[in-house]
């Protein structure tokens, strides 16, 4: 049996190809430097070990060559990439409290309907931050813990586990862009 492959060029991006203005957003300077990495870590009030991991990951990123697999990235100018953009809102646990412009983005992508229909919980990331987090009662009653990574990092119960496990499945030494992730990650669950 032959399997059909969907080529990246064949994907209709029109659903996802839209932008909003950046009013009300906090944005760091472009580039991937030790100062930017330190600023991300400071904004998140991370423990020293996380800053150390970020800086070590940046060293690995700068040392590794660009990959030769996949599409050409010759035109990729890392000095023009902004790695941290924070919407002007705190994390919400009630969908109705999420600002309308952010809510409209997720509505357009179908996220709220997917949550209501299929998921036990969802965390919605908008640019660099988790802006919405909700766990259905049935999952939490079963003892399932679902948290944003930054929230867990500040919880004395979970921080040691994150310290032990963070980036062990795909370590920064795996490849250049795993190292980039280790240096400038933000948000997630």
List where the protein language model places each region.
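Glycine-rich and polybasic anion-binding loops at the starts of cofactor/ligand-binding domains
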Residues: 2-189
């Amino acid at each position: 049996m032959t399997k059909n492959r969907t080529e990246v060029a064949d994907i209709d991006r029109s659903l996802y190809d839209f932008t909003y203005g950046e009013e009300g957003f906090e944005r760091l300077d472009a580039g991937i430097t030790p100062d930017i990495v330190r600023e991300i870590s400071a904004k998140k009030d991370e423990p020293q070990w996380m800053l150390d991991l970020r800086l070590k990951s940046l060293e690995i990123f700068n040392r590794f060559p660009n990959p030769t697999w996949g599409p050409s990235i010759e035109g990729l100018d890392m000095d023009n990439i902004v790695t941290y953009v924070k919407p002007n809102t705190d994390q919400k646990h009630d969908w109705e409290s999420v600002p309308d412009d952010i809510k409209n983005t997720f509505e357009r992508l179908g996220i709220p309907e997917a949550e209501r229909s299929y998921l036990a919980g969802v965390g919605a990331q908008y640019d660099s931050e988790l802006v919405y987090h909700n766990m259905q009662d049935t999952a939490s009653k079963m003892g399932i813990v679902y948290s944003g990574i930054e929230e867990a990092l500040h919880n004395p119960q979970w921080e040691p586990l994150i310290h032990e496990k963070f980036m062990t499945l795909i370590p920064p030494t795996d490849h250049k862009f795993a190292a980039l992730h280790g240096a400038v990650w933000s948000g997630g669950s």
